[in-house]
Amino acid sequence: MAYKNAIMAADDTLVASFERCLELGAVPTVHAENGELVYHLQRKLMAQGITGPEAHPLSRPSQVEGEAASRAIRIAETLGTPLYLVHVSTKEALDEITYARGKGQPVYGEVLAGHLLLDDSVYRDPD
């Protein structure tokens, strides 16, 4: 989850953290992005000379968030813990949350105002 070489948590860390949250009665929070895939795409873009802000959305196609959201939700479901997903920005992630909630799973999603008001064109703006 999240950012490779920074704050990425592997699945074993997620499992241990979710278990600890369950023991404490806390709700785990996840920023759902497949960090390995983002890192791979970033390297490919850099090799192509795409190094400006426009590379940001190109390195994060919607599947990157959808897959990670699905994985986090399934881990939480298996362990019986609620889950709070932050910065939800794709239909794929929303679909995963909606599906889980439809089954009665305590999964919540948060969106940033910018995700509701802006699109990827802001990364191509010369200003």
Each language-model region and where it sits:
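Glycine-rich phosphate/pyrophosphate-binding beta-alpha loops
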Residues: 1-5
